[in-house]
């Protein structure tokens, strides 16, 4: 009485069409075919992006934590979009000045915010072409411009 999937010798078309229609319920498939990574994400589908620092800000972490997470507001060079990026490690905000060029990378899970920092989807990797980690470990100095 129409229970289960067709299993006959001539059922390939039916199975194929059924699978094709139902794949649209899968998030990754839909995202890939519609190209939403290129349309909606600020990076335009790439893993990193350069930008200019507009301002420094402290964002309060979500409950139950209590902290002020150090972030910067950045305008991307490639498309002019403004994003908020987290500055990792203790005291690294001192290496970042306004109007500096920074390299941003993703931060968190599949384009969503990470941990207790609301609405922050990116982190700072380089400042003025120098790795933020190298500056923090005092292995390199920021170039004077």
From Swiss-Prot:
Keywords: Cytoplasm, Hydroxylation, Isopeptide bond, Ribonucleoprotein, Ribosomal protein, Ubl conjugation. The keyword Cytoplasm applies. Component of the ribosome, a large ribonucleoprotein complex responsible for the synthesis of proteins in the cell. The small ribosomal subunit (SSU) binds messenger RNAs (mRNAs) and translates the encoded message by selecting cognate aminoacyl-transfer RNA (tRNA) molecules. The large subunit (LSU) contains the ribosomal catalytic site termed the peptidyl transferase center (PTC), which catalyzes the formation of peptide bonds, thereby polymerizing the amino acids delivered by tRNAs into a polypeptide chain. The keyword Cytoplasm applies. It comes from the Eukaryota. GO terms for molecular function: structural constituent of ribosome. Hydroxylation at Pro-64 affects translation termination efficiency. The stereochemistry of the 3,4-dihydroxyproline has not yet been determined. Component of the small ribosomal subunit (SSU). Mature yeast ribosomes consist of a small (40S) and a large (60S) subunit. The 40S small subunit contains 1 molecule of ribosomal RNA (18S rRNA) and 33 different proteins (encoded by 57 genes). The large 60S subunit contains 3 rRNA molecules (25S, 5.8S and 5S rRNA) and 46 different proteins (encoded by 81 genes). There is a cross-link at residue 56 (Glycyl lysine isopeptide (Lys-Gly) (interchain with G-Cter in ubiquitin)). The lineage of its organism: Eukaryota, Fungi, Dikarya, Ascomycota, Saccharomycotina. It is found in: Cytoplasm. Its main location: cytoplasm. Present with 10600 molecules/cell in log phase SD medium. NCBIfam families: PRK04211.1 (NF003254), uS12_E_A (TIGR00982). One of its GO terms (biological process) is translation. This is Small ribosomal subunit protein uS12A. Gene3D superfamilies: Nucleic acid-binding proteins. Belongs to the universal ribosomal protein uS12 family. Pfam families: Ribosom_S12_S23. One of its GO terms (cellular component) is cytosolic small ribosomal subunit. InterPro entries: NA-bd_OB-fold, Ribosomal_uS12, Ribosomal_uS12_euk/arc. The modification 3,4-dihydroxyproline is found at residue 64.
């Amino acid at each position: 009485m129409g229970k289960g999937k067709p299993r006959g010798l001539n059922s390939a078309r039916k199975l194929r069409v059924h699978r094709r229609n139902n794949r649209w319920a899968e998030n990754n498939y839909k995202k890939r075919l519609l190209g939403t990574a290129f349309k909606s994400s600020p990076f335009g589908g790439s893993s990193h992006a350069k930008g200019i620092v507009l301002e420094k800000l402290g964002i309060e972490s979500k409950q139950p934590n209590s902290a002020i997470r150090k972030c910067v507001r950045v305008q991307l060079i490639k498309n002019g979009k403004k994003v908020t990026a987290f500055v990792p490690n203790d005291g690294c905000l001192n290496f970042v000045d306004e109007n500096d060029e920074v390299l941003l990378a993703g931060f968190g899970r599949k384009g969503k915010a990470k941990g207790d920092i609301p609405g922050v989807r990116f982190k700072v990797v380089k400042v003025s072409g120098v790795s933020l980690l190298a500056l923090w470990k005092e292995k390199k100095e920021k170039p004077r411009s």
